[in-house]
Amino acid sequence: MIYRITKYDPTLRDAEGRYLPWTWTSYSDIGRAVNGCALCPAAYLETERRYTDALICILQALHVDALRVKELEPPVRSSAVLQNDFAEKGLSLSAAQADFLRRVADISEISVPDFEVCFQLQLRECFWCRLVDPQGRAAVWFGYDYYMYVACKEIPAALVRKICAGGLYVEAQTTKGSWLNQNIT
């Protein structure tokens, strides 16, 4: 099963699945008007935290303690360039994030201590990759417009309720014949 996890209420989609209200879709929207108010760094960071917390809880529930880095897409922008980009938006690049960026091109697998930083940097569009559990229990990736995907057999219902109570939406996607039905490792 592939789960799409987003901040977007599925009841506000049209028949083709497009989200109808205009909203922010990237950290680059910080400072732009969203429904009459400028998106501030604090609101962005709160949403980013909800995404990373949800994903970490899912991986814990699935007993995933490592993820292989697959399909890493360059370019990975330099820490100096990102620091300037983030500063313009009222964000910063932490020492842990800068360290991860220096190492990402050479990393084949990440462990729990790197999960949060890796997810934050992908949400901030610093790089893209698919992350796959070596045991085949899950795969994770981020899409355009602040979409997050988890492929796994099942996210426990209680955890789905907890994530939804935290302001995110978990939608099961049925994709017959997808790569998920093959070997995801």
Predicted segments, located by residue:
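Structured alpha/beta or helical-core interaction and ligand-binding surfaces enriched in interleaved
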Residues: M1-Y147, A151-T185
